[in-house]
Amino acid sequence: MLNPSRFRILAIGKVRKSWIQNGLEVYRKRLPGLSITEIRDGDIKKESRAIISSIKKDELLIALCEEGEKFTSMDFSHWLQNLGSSRIVFAIGGTNGLSQEVKTSADLCISLSALTFPHEMARLILAEQLYRAISIAKGSPYHRE
């Protein structure tokens, strides 16, 4: 079964829009144990070092970028389930995205959509998709096809 405490989101910059903060709070309550860490934005090399240095040996790094692999919600849930008990860190870049170094270091690059979203919104969409993935795994009626 999927456990939110296995997931960590590393995101560059702060969420400044209150409606996104409110949305993230909803999903933090629905996903107890989900960790969201903000990394100070600035120089992309410093951001990269901060992301890479924070990954522990037992964690998989998943980089979110537009050229990454695309999943349906069902496929995303099944993919997470197939990872077993692995701890997963999702890295979300700032206004300049993620460096090539982070993308190359990642175990996988995924895309939330063919559309481009502001980095703040990407956090909210990812949190919702993690909740949806867990709901699918539980057989909850939250996800409808």
UniProtKB/Swiss-Prot annotation:
Record-listed E.C. numbers: 2.1.1.177
Localization (cell): Cytoplasm
Matching SUPFAM superfamilies: alpha/beta knot
Catalyzed reactions per annotation: pseudouridine(1915) in 23S rRNA + S-adenosyl-L-methionine = N(3)-methylpseudouridine(1915) in 23S rRNA + S-adenosyl-L-homocysteine + H(+)
Binding residue positions for S-adenosyl-L-methionine: 64, 93, 112-117
Top enzyme category: transferase
Signal peptide segment: none
PANTHER family xref list: METHYLTRANSFERASE, RIBOSOMAL RNA LARGE SUBUNIT METHYLTRANSFERASE H
Family annotation (HAMAP family): 23SrRNA_methyltr_H (MF_00658)
Designated name of the protein: Ribosomal RNA large subunit methyltransferase H
